[in-house]
Amino acid sequence: MERNLLKILVIAGLLLSSTSCKKNVYSVKVYGLKSCGNCRILIDDFKDDENIQLHMIDIDTHILAYKKDIALYDGLSDNQAPVIMTKSFAKAGYSSKEYKVLKKAIILGKKPNLKNYYKRRSNYGNTTQ
């Protein structure tokens, strides 16, 4: 019950931090993308930009990565929010097994090897592969 209350409070805080935020997608800041107002949360529906570098992960892991300041995108500087990939990213070739490895690494406070992620990400939308 306390965990659910924490989730609700975190989400409510994120929504209150910027009235321009969409309610259904929460992600963190990355180069080339616009944040919503003054908050550090990036909103994107992943429909119109093939260069998006991150997406939402389950909220518990998202919060944990943020608290541990784990940046999984090499282009981030130390003062920017951590970047995490999502389960739905399997559609671009990022398998659920790799997602579990990624999530476990976040929980343990480690940075996994994302070589395969970047390779597959560059092929996203390519139907001839």
Regions found by a protein language model. Name each.
Residues S17-S20:
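C-terminal motif of bacterial Sec signal peptides marking the signal peptidase cleavage site
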Residues R3-I11:
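Sec-dependent signal peptide recognition
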Residues M1-E2, K22:
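N-terminal hydrophobic targeting signals that begin at the initiator methionine
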Residues D58-N79, K103-K111:
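Thioredoxin-like thiol-disulfide oxidoreductase module
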Residues K34-N38, D60-I63, F89-A92:
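Solvent-exposed loop/turn segments at secondary-structure junctions
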Residues T86-N126:
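Non-catalytic, surface beta->alpha helical segment in thiol-disulfide oxidoreductase systems
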Residues K22-E50:
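Local sequence-structure signature of Cys/Sec-based thiol-disulfide redox active-site neighborhoods
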